[in-house]
Amino acid sequence: MRRYHRPMARARRIACSLLTACVAIAGLASPAWAHTSATPVATQPAWMRAITTAIGNRPVSVAIGKDGDPWYGHLGWVGRPPASNEKLLLSMALLQRYRPWRTIRTNASATSKPGSRGVVYGNLWIMGHGDPGIDGTRIGVLGRAIRDAGVRHIRGSVIGNTGPFVRDWWARGWKDYFPADYIPLPTALTYRENTDRRGVHITDPELLAAKKLTARLRHLGITVGHKPGMGHAPTGLHPIAQIVSPPLQDLIRRMDLRSRNFWAEVLGKYLGADEWGRGTIANGARAIDRFTDAHGQDFTIYDSSGLSYANRANARGILELLWNADGAPWGPILRAALPSGGRGTLEDRLTDVRIRAKTGTLDDASALSGWVWLERTGGWVEFSILSSGFNEWTAKKIEDRIVRIVSFRATPPP
């Protein structure tokens, strides 16, 4: 992940402005796809010319290819905000590091094991480790596991641990209203996606989890001496009971299907804690950046959800990462995790196309990257479309047009 001192950053902004202006002028003066397309204009098939026509002079980057062979490119090297295509990169980084059946545990722990009479002397701590899907049902399962472990009396309180993740709630490039409107506080111990019953983002999910577990334990006949709370757990605790999340591949699918920002930042902190020692938004971004760097992509990444307007990726780089995924053991798992036409964030789009792709939307920025099926010859082909600087709804119409052209008309170039 790149960082700049102020003089260097100012110089870079000036240089980028000049480069952008040159790109815009060049785009008007000559066919933009000529910069990256593997097929010369004179021999381009009709489907490629149709894509170029659909784009027009708008600032849209397109990269299409299969198995390491680039078929079509249009400004594929230009950096743009990937929006929620960042979650696609996070998904790749997670699947590269962990096995798809990995689970994330949530423990109930205390300073000592319960005695022969089932007494826990002191507090019972709920220890979260980054499962974004804890809710009342899962807390109920934890309560029964505590009972089955022989606990009958808790002399202290049930307390939700506020560690081990750092409680940061900001990334460079976020708008000031994002924490209130788009991303709840990402914590290690979550509860109901860290919102209250009205959907308002809260700052004490650990307390709500502790209250819920206290109520469930009492319902199960376990006495609890004091009211629930939240705080930083002491060291040296002994696990008494635990629950585990669904497999990682299921967590990724739930995140990508509806493009859940909260899930992305929690899983990003989980990955960041493993790779950099502390669960922060910045370290989650650094972990994704490490993955993309290792595969030759010089992206700029500040979060895991893609909310940051300062993030930069390019269509050609995403295409190459999709090629890498195709050759990885986890490639089919990633493809299956992405929305199909008419499902998730594609619920009103591309119902007539066989597609698996990740969407992305910010104000004046849009993205769609993944796999589309070739109806003429069969087989999946990878693609990435990024746009910026104009209305995202217009951009999505262009995306859909391009995908349909590829699906129904494209064949491998000669």
Which residues fall in each region the model found?
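Secretory targeting and sorting signals
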Residues: 2-35
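Beta-lactamase-like hydrolase cores
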Residues: 22-25, 32-81, 100-101, 105, ...
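Small-residue-rich helix-loop
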Residues: 71-73, 272-414
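Short, well-structured active-site flanking segments
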Residues: 96-112, 221-230, 331-335
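Active-site-adjacent, His/Asp/Glu-enriched structural segments that form or flank metal-binding
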Residues: 104-165, 179-180, 190-191
